[in-house]
Amino acid sequence: MVATPSTSAPTKGVVRQVIGPVLDVEFPAGKLPKILNALRIESKNPAGQDIALTAEVQQLLGDHRVRAVAMSGTDGLVRGMEATDTGAPISVPVGEATLGRIFNVLGEPVDEQGPVKTSDTAPIHRSAPKLTDLETKPKVFETGIKVIDLLAPYRQGGKVGLFGGAGVGKTVLIQELINNIAKEHGGVSVFGGVGERTREGNDLYEEFKESGVINAEDLSQSKVALCFGQMNEPPGARMRVGLSALTMAEHFRDVNKQDVLLFVDNIFRFVQAGSEVSALLGRMPSAVGYQPTLGTDVGALQERITSTLEGSITSIQAVYVPADDLTDPAPATTFAHLDATTVLARGLAAKGIYPAVDPLDSTSTMLQPSVVGDDHYKTARAVQSTLQRYKELQDIIAILGLDELSEEDRLTVSRARKIEKFLSQPFFVAEIFTGMSGKYVKLEDTIAGFNMILAGELDDLPEQAFYLVGNIEEVKAKADKINSEK
């Protein structure tokens, strides 16, 4: 396990000031809690209702006072209430018992399924793994999804940015990745819902149950743990829930020695919450009103997401770009940490091409001959140049029609349309909607299939045979079926 912050003996303090989610607490001389320690306040408000609140120490003010940020609403809190220093940072449950459950930032279950059956906990603030413990050789993480594995491969222990508007298939893609890592890699997933809508979190949970990612009958057979800090919660909770999810993922990597997928939706909300907390603590804002510690905050989270010699955490982070401005400090700082980007295009979704991953806009630092090999690299670049040429010809086709193109361009268009259709595939988690069995396509089969299309070996097969299939053998079988029905 990575080194954890030292703990100190619990002491009692008194709340002296409450301003929104920020509270000042006075402690006896020489008994001040350490920075990042959790304070616990358990009392009754004037109406006699119970108050149970956790806050995290952010500043030592002098005069035996500390300033802390609350992890839940401060309604009913009054001066004079007793606050206990827990002597350690916020800790969350870890291990197999977390699978199939939903937690808040404090690691408390919020799914009404009873207490978590584990005594194992870990603090959310920890050091990143030492350089000597890191796996430095880049290794491709096979997802079984053709378009990703061929054109924008993920790095094992890397970070991927997931870009896309509403309704283009982000959730289904996330579910499929969770399903595939469990079945093919024996890994598990952790989902961190950071500052998004409660409705979306509920929908995701229900869809996970529907698709079998969460097994409601036997939670131990589930493939994912969920950790939510929704947009109605105080900024402290939204700022820390990403670390709570990451801590659960680190346990699977470091103790169980598994490959883990960590989903963060949305990484921008993590930065936004940090900005709110920074302003509440009275720090001078930096560019565009963001916190002056923006780079450090993002780095502290991202540096813990990595491959070690024991296992890996591969992170897929949904990135909201405010006002579509890629130069905004929040997305710009995030981009510096990403190894790959998966861009979902509405135009492809409208054509019925699922997954709607844009083959020209999606990128990966792994797509280089020294990492993926010459064959993979050349195939990927040939596929992209064919699709790029097709894109350039679309205006001419729209105005003059296909017949006005040269023989060579007509052939390019024909192959590009087959490539576009072959980049689609049926998903396991979508079986209940499509009625088609899902397909996991091995990387070598993907490369071989696209090479055959590019070489013209499949020019005589009908276009629709390439739509929503797995490997090239299925294309041929589908083509035979189409021809026999004519």
From Swiss-Prot:
Major subcellular site: membrane
Any GO CC annotation of this UniProt entry: plasma membrane-derived thylakoid membrane
Range of residues in the leader sequence: none
Coiled coil (residue ranges): none
GO molecular function: ATP binding; ATP hydrolysis activity; proton-transporting ATP synthase activity, rotational mechanism
Pfam families in the cross-refs: ATP-synt_ab (PF00006), ATP-synt_ab_N (PF02874), ATP-synt_VA_C (PF22919)
Compartments where found: Cellular thylakoid membrane
Reactions this protein catalyses: ATP + H2O + 4 H(+)(in) = ADP + phosphate + 5 H(+)(out)
Taxonomic superkingdom: Bacteria
EC numbers: 7.1.2.2
Record keywords, A-Z: ATP synthesis, ATP-binding, CF(1), Hydrogen ion transport, Ion transport, Membrane, Nucleotide-binding, Thylakoid, Translocase, Transport
Membrane topology summary: Peripheral membrane protein
PROSITE patterns, alphabetized: ATPASE_ALPHA_BETA
Gene3D superfamilies: 2.40.10.170, Bovine Mitochondrial F1-atpase, Atp Synthase Beta Chain, Chain D, domain 3 (1.10.1140.10), P-loop containing nucleotide triphosphate hydrolases (3.40.50.300)
Binding positions for ATP per the UniProt entry: G164, G165, A166, G167, V168, G169, K170, T171
Subunit structure: F-type ATPases have 2 components, CF(1) - the catalytic core - and CF(0) - the membrane proton channel. CF(1) has five subunits: alpha(3), beta(3), gamma(1), delta(1), epsilon(1). CF(0) has four main subunits: a(1), b(1), b'(1) and c(9-12).
Record-stated family: Belongs to the ATPase alpha/beta chains family.
Function: Produces ATP from ADP in the presence of a proton gradient across the membrane. The catalytic sites are hosted primarily by the beta subunits.
Protein name in UniProt: ATP synthase subunit beta
Gene: atpD
